Amino acid sequence: MDEFHRNGKEDSSWQQCFLYPLFFQEDLYAIYHDHYLDGSSSSEPMEHVSSNDQFSFLTVKRLIGQIRQQNHSIFLFVNRDPNPLVDRNKSSYSESVLEGLTLVLEVPFSIRSKNSVEGINEWKSFRSIHSIFPFLEDKFPHSNYISDTRIPYSIHPEILVRTFRRWIRDAPSLHLLRSVLYEYRNSSENLQRSLIVAPRVNTRFFLFLWNHYVYECESILVPLLKRSSHSRSLSHGSFPERTHFNRKIKHILIFSRRNSLKRIWSLKDPNIHYVRYGERSIIAIKGTHLLVKKCRYHLLIFRQCYFHLWFEPYRVCSHQLSKNCSSSLGYFLRIRMKPLLVRTKMLDELFIADLITGEFDPIVPIIPIIGLLAREKFCDISGRPISKLSWTSLTDDDILDRFDRIWRNIFHYYSGSFGRDGLYRIKYILSLSCAKTLACKHKSTIRVVRKELGPELFKKSFSKEREFDSPPFSSKSGARSQRERIWHSDIPQINPLANSWQKIQDLKVENLFDQ
């Protein structure tokens, strides 16, 4: 495989016939077995995997022999379980074959994606989800509309095969992939839609298929959006004098209408910006309401006609940033209008201009998060802390570590918001719930627990907040300002509470369209 990685860019013969023989190499499944034991090949934690599942290379060799004799993959999934691919704990053999198939398909995909990234320097992947927020902070204030789209997980098997056929010319491999996809479709419960539905099937194989499909869409969509921009200069919308100049030039009538529009257009920033995380894609647009409707219509037609992907109406929402808040990534996203006074002195005269600029202002949904904490039994519906009874069987260190981890994740994730006063209300709920849990475990009161543990109780738990009050994060006065932002670069996914709240918001929107 390393040789294919080295020579893939120079020689395209690897697309012809190398994939299919690799499917039947026992060493490939030995690689998967090592990853399976280490827990690195699956996106699920190892505690969700049954310990009774035993991997048998003899069974894998027999399955490979059956494939060689019968020339199709049906025998991979019969005579095992009635629904072998849906239940991971009952089908380690089928899972191993799917993981081996994924390892093979990832070789040309990684080569192709690497070459694409080398050709487009601006399109880079980041580990942290917070890499999205600096982009939003830079582009959102200069946009007046936002289109939030939820990409569906349901994809027809034949569409996936066609996307692979564009860059793999190995026909046996495509036939094997088609057999696997259709066999999974036939074994699933929903036979009427004839679609692969993978939000709950969190395996490496289906995640790879969905990511590859989205990559195919974006590899065509993103260059089109960049090409639609008439200006290739650096962003200048944040300069007050440029913003004021753009407003005044619209009233100049000494040029003809056609030339004036061309000059004004050449001075504007690119008016369409695209960003995606997971299943959510956000497009920020600067223009009129008619332009937004046209852009939304053309994007839907592009995805439906070119990739045969149907979007339900509730999956596409458009908002005007100056009037409405958009819920995304666990935040309320809005643009806060901020007045700005600019004084310009020319010779002996002083000119004063009053400008209004937009500022990206993500809001923490405090009340919904408290409601989720109440659902998890940390407090009641009014926000009053209660003891976590299910944790009383743990040790004191485990209880403190769990509460500490919950608070640290919440505080780190929402550290980029301006108003962080509500976060300290969540800290109060978690800290008092921690004390009540320890008191309930030892059958005493909060005062006794605090007296026995002393200052170590809350020094050990919730201590990570001190990192933000020390250099280099602190200001000169020794405390962080409420207008300072810190986007952490070590957050790989959405906070669980924020993710739960986002799903509730999406469900509310879906119910509104159903009514």
UniProtKB/Swiss-Prot annotation:
Biological process, per Gene Ontology: mRNA processing; RNA splicing; tRNA processing
Compartment(s) of residence: Plastid, Chloroplast
An example molecular function term from Gene Ontology annotations: RNA binding
Main location: plastid
Disulphide-bonded residues: none
Entry's Gene Ontology cellular component terms: chloroplast
Keywords annotated in UniProt: Chloroplast, mRNA processing, Plastid, RNA-binding, tRNA processing
Function summary: Usually encoded in the trnK tRNA gene intron. Probably assists in splicing its own and other chloroplast group II introns.
Entry similarity comment: Belongs to the intron maturase 2 family. MatK subfamily.
PANTHER family, per the entry: MATURASE K (PTHR34811:SF1)
Protein name: Maturase K
Organism (species): Pseudotsuga menziesii
